[in-house]
């Protein structure tokens, strides 16, 4: 638990450095701009598609028969937003992971772990594959759990759990791939998966805090890099794996 809090705290101190501040806001702003632009051009098409999807359900027929057509219309808007919100999150996190993580890892390693040997256990293809798996699983779980969103069941919990999964799955590979060997990478995943998920939950909470949510993608990259490199250093100090 201490190493999780330590990584979380160091992420906040690191993000204040000018090099990191320059990276912070634009992933979320770029994601918002992209999806709002797409919504501007395709909102009518998306609404028609969602309306047709809902119209085929038994619940929609029952609501319309009993004079609750407005509920159906609001359900269309709600479902579209519930699909749009994770797309914005995925896009912002992907921008940070793909374009900014090399800079983040280099910054953290130079300032905090200058003597840590690079054993390059990861590959470019491995990073791409990891990102694809993370996004597909996250999107699939979000879609599968949509009925729970509409019923209100687990609404406070689901976003945290899903965002935590995306955070830890996406950032852990890039945080470790340059410095950890393949054996060290596997050892860290086996022994620290729970702590990485906890770190993912703590970072997911930032998306609910105004202004901090703009920094969340870069803070996530910093936190997982601090956590990962500290674990690599600890393994080598103990002569493991």
What are these regions, as identified by a protein language model?
Residues 137-150, 207-211, 215:
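Alpha-helical transmembrane segments and their membrane-interface junctions
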Residues 168-196, 200-201:
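Hydrophobic alpha-helical transmembrane segments and adjacent short intramembrane/lumenal linkers
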């Amino acid at each position: 638990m201490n190493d999780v809090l330590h990584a979380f705290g160091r992420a906040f101190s690191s993000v204040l450095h000018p090099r990191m501040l320059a990276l912070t806001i634009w992933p979320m702003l770029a994601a918002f701009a992209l999806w709002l632009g797409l919504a501007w051009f395709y909102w009518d098409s998306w609404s028609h598609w969602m309306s047709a999807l809902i119209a085929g359900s038994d619940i929609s027929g029952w609501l319309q028969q009993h004079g609750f057509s407005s509920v159906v219309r609001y359900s269309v808007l709600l479902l579209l937003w519930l699909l749009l919100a994770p797309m914005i999150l995925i896009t912002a996190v992907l921008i940070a992971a793909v374009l900014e993580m090399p800079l983040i890892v280099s910054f953290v390693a130079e300032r905090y772990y200058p003597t840590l040997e690079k054993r390059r256990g990861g590959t470019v293809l491995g990073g791409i594959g990891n990102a694809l798996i993370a996004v597909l699983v996250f999107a699939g779980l979000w879609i599968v759990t949509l009925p729970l969103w509409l019923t209100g069941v687990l609404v406070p919990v689901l976003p945290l759990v899903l965002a935590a999964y995306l955070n830890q799955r996406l950032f852990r590979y890039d945080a470790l791939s340059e410095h950890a060997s393949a054996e060290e990478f596997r050892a860290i995943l086996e022994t620290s998966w729970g702590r990485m998920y906890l770190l993912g939950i703590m970072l997911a909470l930032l998306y609910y805090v105004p202004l901090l949510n703009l920094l969340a993608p870069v803070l996530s990259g910093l936190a997982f890099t601090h956590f990962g490199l500290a674990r690599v250093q600890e393994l080598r100090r103990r002569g493991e794996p």
